[in-house]
Regions:
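Bacterial N-terminal signal peptides that target proteins for export
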Residues: 1-11
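Bacterial N-terminal signal peptides
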Residues: 9-19
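N-terminal mature-domain "stem" immediately C-terminal to a signal peptide or N-terminal signal-anchor/transmembrane
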Residues: 28-103, 111, 117
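Secondary-structure boundary elements
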Residues: 64, 83, 90-281
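Hydrophobic/aromatic-rich core segments of domains that either
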Residues: 271-273, 277, 288-372
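Low-complexity, Gly/Ser/Thr/Pro-rich intrinsically disordered linker/tail segments
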Residues: 332-410, 415-425, 437-442
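Extended amphipathic alpha-helical coiled-coil/heptad-repeat regions
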Residues: 383, 393-576
Length: 576
């Protein structure tokens, strides 16, 4: 069977779609996008309104060809992906920027025309590396400002500039860098997007970085520029001596562990300014502070890094992921394997949404910045260009089939379903497809299962609910036991809400027996024991509280002087 015939069969099988996935190639001229055409198209408009009309015309041409030839054939047309990337960049980045910022100012329009016409890679980079939640107007503003500072430097470090624009397009969240420091104590002085850009450029020119930022991917660079701390802090971190990325773990040992804070229940930094020199040379810190110190040191040296926090046998712990350009990401720097952490949580620097270490491994392990993923991002852009057409759902699903480990097209489709008031059964089918697609990543799969569980509950499908609930607990008893514990507590809470105290207690005891005491300490306490006991306290169930205390002590082994031990004692002492 020829490759062409294989494509034809796949296109017809996919979602039963024939209309836009037809393989009959019709003659419908599209611009042959190359460097010369790129320059002429971006410059060949006399006004913002003329440019906007031209963008819509280009999008219309693409859609006409799409409807006649189908996406499989169309995506084989030379330069098609660059054509879509430029159309997407123009429609979703440039036009909104011009409409909001001095749209009637001819000089501003000419400036942006010149900017993109002379920087051929910018539309492609933005289309392939942006996220649908990015503040696209602010992205263009940042890029223009960085280009105007020094056009030559910008041309050399364009990927760095793109990374800065995608991270700094919105304010850093209040939860940065972690919850154990007050924002007022952070060493941040008038944060501005030019600061990380200038620092990395100058550090590279001075030979102070591990890697050449011009050779790194935009996604990797996002994990370098995602810090608003002052240049003074970065310079301090930069002078710390390490020879290899593997040496980062050794930095934990140079920071004294502040056991007095644990003993005094002072988990939030109590020493004023949260500076690296205070952590490293004066006050020391607990695991969150140690990991923050090492993470900032890595970034100052141009090493992509991310801080994770998770629950283990002894309670909460912090560690980090660090990127070695030769061997890739290591998500276990400073992690205590004996603690059996099922998962670590962090902030994705591009969206500031929560991400787990297992999700990052899952995505980067197969696709990441691979050609298929980048191709899928352009197909996703094509879907967004058709958001108001009947082709949208078919295109969004096609893009997700090309990059099956990406969550983004699924999030977009779910938003579309809810915005269009889809019924519960339609949303249930969506989550069923999600579960099948993400079956290899337990956290993502469980997200779909839990969502489907709630739909079964709303539809009063009791047998389906009970069956799926048992399945989630069974599948996540070992590696992602935190998910199973959460499902168990949800059932216990439902019984408590109905004042079925004896049944709730039986389920509580079953959960303790089910997970045992080998590895689940922190999650078992914070996700099961603590909320269970709080509910009992509200209803003055003192006998059951005392029974919960004695049972929990059998199953949760705490080490004296740990956060978990403190919180365990504190829970029952407060109730007494």
């Amino acid at each position: 069977m020829t490759l062409l015939k294989q494509f034809m069969i796949v296109s017809l099988m996919f979602s039963g779609v024939i209309t836009i996935f037809s393989t009959e190639l019709k003659s419908q001229n599209l611009p042959k996008w190359n460097d010369e055409y790129h320059k002429n198209w971006w410059m060949n408009h006399g006004s913002v309104s003329e440019f906007t009309q031209s963008v819509e015309l280009l999008n219309k041409q693409i859609n006409e060809r799409l409807n006649k030839d189908g996406i499989v054939k169309l995506s084989q047309v030379p330069s098609f992906f660059e054509l879509v990337a430029n159309t997407f960049c123009a429609k979703y980045f440039v036009v909104p920027y011009l409409n909001k910022h001095q749209g009637s100012d001819n000089a501003s329009f000419k400036q942006i025309q010149k900017f993109i016409s002379n920087n051929f890679n910018v539309p492609g980079y933005l289309t392939r590396c942006s996220h649908y939640k990015d503040n696209k107007i602010e992205v263009i503003k940042i890029l223009l400002d960085l280009k105007n500072k020094d056009p030559k430097i910008f041309a050399d470090y364009v990927k760095l500039a793109i990374a800065v624009s995608l991270v700094w397009d919105v304010e850093f969240p209040d939860s940065w860098p972690h919850q154990n420091v007050n924002n007022a104590d952070l060493p941040i002085l008038n944060p501005h997007f030019s600061q990380p850009y200038d620092f990395i450029v100058q550090s590279h020119l001075n030979g102070n970085l591990f890697y050449d930022p011009r050779r790194m991917t935009i996604r990797e660079l996002c994990f370098v520029v995602d810090t608003p701390v002052s240049t003074k802090e970065k310079l301090y971190a930069q002078q710390i001596k390490i020879k290899r990325v593997n040496d980062l773990e050794g930095l934990y040992k140079m920071i004294p562990y502040d056991q007095n804070r644990i003993n005094s229940n002072l988990y939030t930094w109590p020493y004023g300014e949260y500076s690296l020199i205070k952590i490293g040379a004066k006050n020391g810190g607990i695991c969150m502070d140690q990991s923050y110190f090492v993470c900032q040191t890595a970034k100052a040296k141009g090493i992509p890094s991310i801080l994770f926090m998770g629950q283990g046998r002894s309670g909460v712990h912090a560690w980090l992921g660090a990127f070695d350009i030769g061997s890739g990401w290591d998500f276990t720097v400073g992690k205590w394997e004996s603690e059996k952490y099922p998962v670590g949580y962090a902030l994705d620097p591009q969206t500031w949404s929560q991400i787990t270490n297992s999700e990052m491994e899952y995505y980067l392990g197969s696709s990441g910045d691979s050609p298929s993923s980048l191709r899928g991002k352009v197909l996703l852009a094509l879907a967004l260009l058709n958001k108001d057409s009947t082709n949208f759902v078919k295109l969004i699903r096609y893009s997700s089939s090309v990059m099956p480990r990406s969550i983004e097209p699924w999030d977009i489709e779910y938003e579309w379903l809810t915005n269009n008031n889809a019924d519960l059964k339609s949303i249930g089918r969506f989550w069923s497809r999600w579960i099948k697609n993400f079956k290899e990543e337990s956290g993502l799969k469980a997200r779909g299962q839990i969502a489907l569980l709630q739909i079964f509950k709303k539809l009063e499908m009791k047998k389906n609910y009970e069956s799926l609930s048992k399945q989630i607990i069974s599948e996540n008893k070992s590696k992602r036991f935190d998910l199973g514990i959460s499902i168990d507590y949800e059932e216990i809470k439902n019984l408590q809400d109905k004042l079925k105290w004896r049944e709730a207690e039986d389920k509580f005891i079953f959960a303790l027996n089910n997970y045992g005491k080998e590895k689940s300490g922190g999650h078992l306490f914070y996700n099961l024991v603590q909320p269970y006991v709080h509910k009992l306290y509200l209803h003055k169930k003192n006998d059951q509280i005392e029974k919960a205390r004695s049972l929990s002590r059998k199953y949760i082994v705490t080490n004296k002087g740990t956060i978990l031990d403190n919180d365990f004692i504190k829970l029952f002492d407060q109730i007494e």
